[in-house]
Amino acid sequence: MITLKNVILRRSAKVLLDGATVTLNPGEKVGLVGRNGAGKSTLFALLNGTLHEDGGDFSVPKQWRMAQVAQNMPETEESATDFVVGGDTRLTELREALAAIEAAYTASPDDADIGMELAHAYTDLADAGEHDAVPRAQALILGLGFKAHELDAPVNSFSGGWRMRLQLARALMCPSDLLLLDEPTNHLDLDALVWLEAWLQRYAGTMIVISHDREFLDAVTDVTLHIANAQLTRYGGTVSYTHLTLPTKA
């Protein structure tokens, strides 16, 4: 579980959390709401390890894998499919490990220990889903509104909004126990939005999402976390259930 106990969090001279205490349980889908500038994105920075608490105790299980949509505009000639496949960090790590072992085996083909390592590396890669990585990535890309003929198109050939859809697909491709989403519906049309809602409803891990879209939050979350006056308040229900007012999008 994720726990904050009497956490103090500052950005420069501004105190964003002052003695905040809350617990989020595994598998909960949380809508993080609050006025613009209240500290929602800063809390994400605490969760992903970019920032550290200035006081109190904060913990996320060390074994949890985390996924988050990169906010930078991707600049690459990689195909859309290859770019999204690269979001599977576990697969990438295993591919790199396999390449290193294959190089060692080429240099010492009679070394039985290296041969055994090579066999284990192939097994690990298969267990991680190497065989269906491409179709899994392409299902995400198509679900977010791309056409079949665009699957092999270079990322740089797309406009900014479509590239950010690819960043979203890349985050969804990453095996994760904790998924952080900051305004994920930006750049999405209705069909892609409906598809994303269905995907997130099936997601088995813990999810925390920032959004100004009340209907979207109602569709994909079951817990609401409200940040206001440097405190966190947890509600057992969607944002509509809590009757909280969402700020207009900045």
Language model segments and positions:
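ABC ATP-binding cassette signature C-motif
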Residues: 1-244
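A short, hydrophobic C-terminal helix/tail in secreted or cell-surface proteins
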Residues: 245-250
